[in-house]
A protein has these predicted regions:
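Conserved phosphate- and dinucleotide-binding cores of soluble alpha/beta proteins
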Residues: 1, 80-250
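N-terminal active-site beta-alpha-beta segment that forms phosphate/nucleotide-binding
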Residues: 5-117, 222, 230-250
């Protein structure tokens, strides 16, 4: 049928990816494929692009092909998960884009969340970590998925987000995250113990990145995506048509 599009106050008119399957993985793959196909149009020689890991981005890595640009710098905008238990392909995505953009990948050499706010503050001052975070703030493009607050996420299952963090975030009204930064239904950052222990850029810093590409699929992302758009954390959206139509309905 005709390709539907969505108009939202915080987005240009956005074509939606046709939903051709009832299998969530297939829908996710189609959305990732559409976003990956357009990636080169957002990049120039020497562009700095930030990526955040997660299930959607792990899938995205499979569809990246030569970008026709050179010297692209790819930087991880959130620290590593405890990858021993749950592979998330954080490095796969950075490496795939770096190869396709004939450039280099930089990771934040630290876990996404550490044991205390004090350790987080110290680590953010450590030379290599500080350099990676500085580069992340200099991105012209950020590429990320949208997470909902759920125990079935890599963040929770890997132990980076503890049960007490989950309960605190829930009590404070968190509905989802981008780049492991949680926000409430109005799209406002939720301050929490987890936020203080996190090694990543902040939502305020993300907001300053000119080109923010959000990739999302599945109706369970509805509330989180709606809030992320209210918060203006996404200005280029790739979503399936079922999810996109829900945004108009809210």
């Amino acid at each position: 049928g005709p390709s539907h599009s969505v108009t939202h106050p915080n987005l240009p008119e956005t074509p939606l990816v046709p939903k051709l399957s009832d299998a969530p993985v297939a829908v996710q793959e189609d959305v990732c494929r559409a976003a990956a196909k357009d990636l080169s149009s957002y990049l120039n020689d020497g562009s700095i692009i930030g990526t955040a890991w997660g299930r959607t981005m792990k899938s995205f890595a499979n569809y990246v092909s030569d970008l026709g640009v050179h010297n692209v710098k790819v930087v991880q905008i959130n620290g590593k998960t405890n990858e021993t238990s749950v592979p998330v392909g954080a490095d796969d995505l950075s490496q795939a884009i770096a190869r396709a953009g004939h450039g280099e990948a930089y990771v934040i050499p630290a876990p996404v969340a550490v044991d205390s706010a004090e350790i987080a503050e110290m680590l953010k001052k450590e030379r290599n970590i500080s350099a990676a975070l500085t580069l992340a703030r200099e991105c012209q493009i950020a590429l990320f998925g949208v997470g909902n607050l759920s125990r079935n996420t890599i963040l929770y299952r890997s132990g980076s987000l503890k049960e007490e963090d989950f309960i605190e975030l829930e009590e404070k009204g968190a509905v989802g995250d981008v780049c492991t930064c949680f926000f409430d239904a109005r799209g406002e950052a939720v301050s929490s113990s987890f936020a203080k222990r996190r090694i990543s850029i902040t939502l305020e810093e993300l907001k300053k990145i000119p080109c923010k590409i959000g990739v999302a699929s599945g109706l369970e992302k509805k509330e989180a995506l709606h809030a992320a758009l209210l918060g203006e954390y996404i200005n280029i959206l790739y979503a399936d048509e079922e999810l996109g139509k829900e945004l108009i309905a809210i």
